[in-house]
Amino acid sequence: MKTIISFLLLIFIFSCSAPKEEQLKKQVKRYASVIKVKPEKLDYYKELHANPWPEVNAMLKECNIQNYSIYYRDGMLFSYMEYTGNDFEADMKKMAADPMTQKWWKETDPCQEPVESAEEGEWWAGLEEVYHLE
């Protein structure tokens, strides 16, 4: 009987201290952005992303990015990602300083051009979220 009570007490303690699903969801920040792809570079861009460099994928994960996707339609690339870290700016600086990521961008950047509405210095233009369903 003492063992059962101890076991139930342990379960209660762990269930109270474990992060709730709602808390975990709140830690995820969603980002979407858009950029043009040059028509003559589309096939090369798709080829690169069909076989992404493992080091680049590892850096994305190391910088707290998950569930990252890029879609294409009518000359436009649309990206979606989820960020789970605590300092987005620091993680983006870390990624930008990574030598393999820099090499990757030297391959992908010539394939792209900012949309007309991009802000000064903005490459991928951030999008406003207008709806989300949990």
Stretches with model-predicted labels:
Residues 57-78, 82-86:
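Short, glycine- and small/hydrophobic-rich beta-strand elements in well-ordered beta-sheets
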Residues 31-36:
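Active-site-flanking beta-strand signature of metal-NTP-handling nucleotidyl enzymes
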